[in-house]
C-alpha cells in the first residue's frame, strides 16, 4: 500500500532538494567567462583574468550563501520525520528561488561597476530576502505543524533554530535597503550573513 503524502518519510524530498542545491551551486561557475582572444591579445591573459574580479566576488558570495542554505536545509530535515502537502509546497518554493540565484549573481557580476549597479544589487539582495522569508516559513510550518517533527527532536534545539532563523529576513531586508544607498555595503552584508549563518549552524 502506498503511503499518503502526510505520512511519507522525508528521504525522497531531501534527495531531490540536495540535487537542486547541487545544480544551482554548479551553475554559478558558468557565469565566469573565459577571456576572449581579442581581449587577451590587447591586455594580456593575467590582466584579463584580473578584470573578472566582479564575477569572482559574485560567485564567492553566492556560493557561500547557497552552501549555508543547504547546510541549514539539512539541519531542518534532521529534525523532520514526516511531511505534508504544505511542507512540500514551501520546500518547492524555496527550491525555485534557489535555482534562480545564478541569474542575479550574473547580473551583479556584469553591473557591479556600472552606473546601474544599485539595480543589480537590489535584485541580488532581493532574491536572498525572498529565500530567507520562505526558509523561515518552511521551518515554522515544520516546527508547529502536528506530528512533522521527529520524536527524537530536542525541544530546546527546535526553539534555538526558530530564534536563529527569525533574524534572517530582517537582516536581508537591511541588505536590500542598503542596495539603494551603497552597492558595496549591500553585497558585504550578504557575504557576512552567509558567514554568520554558517557559524550559527554549528552552534
Swiss-Prot record:
Residues 1-7, 79-84, 143-154, 200-203 are cytoplasmic. Its main location: membrane. It is found in: Membrane. Changing residue 23 to A/C/N: Impaired selectivity. Can conduct both K(+) and Na(+). One of its GO terms (biological process) is protein homotetramerization. Residues 44-50 are annotated as: Short helix H2. InterPro entries: TMEM175-like. The chain crosses the membrane at residues 8-31, 53-78, 85-110, 118-142, 155-181, 184-199. Residues 32-52, 111-117, 182-183 are extracellular. Residues 37-42 are annotated as: Short helix H1. A motif (RxxxFSD motif) lies at residues 12-18. It catalyses: K(+)(in) = K(+)(out). Pfam families: TMEM175. It comes from the Bacteria. Keywords: Ion channel, Ion transport, Membrane, Potassium, Potassium channel, Potassium transport, Transmembrane, Transmembrane helix, Transport. It is a multi-pass membrane protein. In contrast to canonical tetrameric potassium channels, lacks the TVGYG selectivity filter motif and presents a completely different structure. The six transmembrane regions are tightly packed within each subunit without undergoing domain swapping. Transmembranes TM1-TM3 are positioned on the inner circle of the channel tetramer and participate in inter-subunit interactions that are central to the assembly of the ion conduction pore. Potassium channel. The channel is permeable for K(+), Rb(+) and Cs(+), while it is unable to conduct Na(+). This is Potassium channel Cha6605_3372.
